[in-house]
Amino acid sequence: MRERTKNAFSFLFLQKGGWLVMTKETKLERDFQSKLIKELKKIFVGCLVMKLDSSYIQGIPDLLILYNNKWATLECKKSAKASKRPNQDYYVGLMNKMSFSRFICPENKEEVLNELQQTFKT
C-alpha cells in the first residue's frame, strides 16, 4: 500500500517576461494580504494602500500605506516561519529607520497593527 502524503499543488501563469509559478503557499500569503488590505482601509479611513513591485527592487516590502502625512511598509508572510527572500531584512530595516516597516503574518498581525496605529497617531 502506498503511503499518503499531503497534496501540493501549483499553477503556472504566463506573464510578460516569463512564467509565474503560483504555489499553495503563495496563495495563502496572497489571501492574507488581501484581507489585511481591507482591514487597513477600515482602520485607517482614507488611507492609500499600494502593492509594491518586488520584481523592480528585489526584497522591497509588499505594501506601502499612506495615511495623512505618514507612511509605512509591510512585508506580508503566510506564517511566522515562512522564509524570507534576499534583501527583505535589509529593506524592512532601512524603511523602519525612515518611518515604519514590519514583517506581518497572522501570528503577529494584531501587535503590528497596534504599533502602526501608535505610529500614525503621533
Walk through the language-model features, giving the residues of each.
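Catalytic phosphate/metal-binding cores of nucleic-acid and nucleotide-processing enzymes, i.e., regions
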Residues: 2-122
